[in-house]
Amino acid sequence: SGSTTVKLVVVDEKSQILYTNYQPNLGNPLPLIREQLLKIYQEHPGLQVASVTTTGYGEELVKNAFRCDYGLVETVAHFTAAKYFMPDVDFIIDIGGQDMKCFKIEDGAISNIFLNEACSSGCGSFLQTFAQALGYDVKKFAALGLFADRPVDLGSRCTVFMNSSVKQAQKDGASIENISAGLSISVVKNALYKVIRASSPEELGRKIVVQGGTFYNV
């Protein structure tokens, strides 16, 4: 259970996915999770659950509410997943709903963690806020950015200041496509300049894995 969404996945003993669900948590994830658990058992009536693990911002809340077997720290969950798909991963970037995390991997372990500043600028809720303000669903809004011909330079400031920049861009006649692309570029800039702060690409590593729902939109 993350800051803005809830994700559930059921895998079998061969790590094959049997069921997945991804949805906004609406500020109260427990009823949504309960609904999905009931649906899982309805679709797989003979299902024998070996164990249940929770992670994310709602790790302890969900674990205690549903008496789950294990709780896994989010950073370890990110690393474990990345290593499963790329055993020699040496850098992980996660952009979630309200935070951004980067992990440096050395000798098979997390050696350093970089976090965004207190402001949630550059995360999923950042894009969603502007999409809704402009009257668009976030998926459609992000897709419009693919048709930009002159992305607006919005920098990498916090949401409050970015809002004034977007309004000014609209007054200057910028299209929705160019505003969308500009906001997506600002997410990338935020990661590079305020979180990673690498002086060269080589500092990131050679095997990089990206995670988090925001990557669907940038």
Predicted regions and their residues:
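Glycine-rich phosphate-binding loop plus the immediately following alpha-helix
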Residues: N28-P29, D107-R150
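Short beta-strand-loop/turn "lid" adjacent to the catalytic site in phosphate-handling enzymes
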Residues: Y22-N25, Y41-T75, K104, S111-N112
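Short glycine-rich, Thr/Ser-proximal phosphate-binding strand/loop in the N-terminal lobe
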Residues: S1-K39, N112-I113, E117-C119
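Gly/Thr-rich phosphate-binding beta-strand-loop-beta motif of the actin/hexokinase/Hsp70
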Residues: S1-K14, V89-E106
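Glycine-rich phosphate-binding loops at beta-strand->alpha-helix junctions
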Residues: G58, S186, S199-V218
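Phosphate/pyrophosphate-binding loops at sites that engage ATP/ADP/AMP, CoA/4′-phosphopantetheine
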Residues: L37-A50, A191-L204
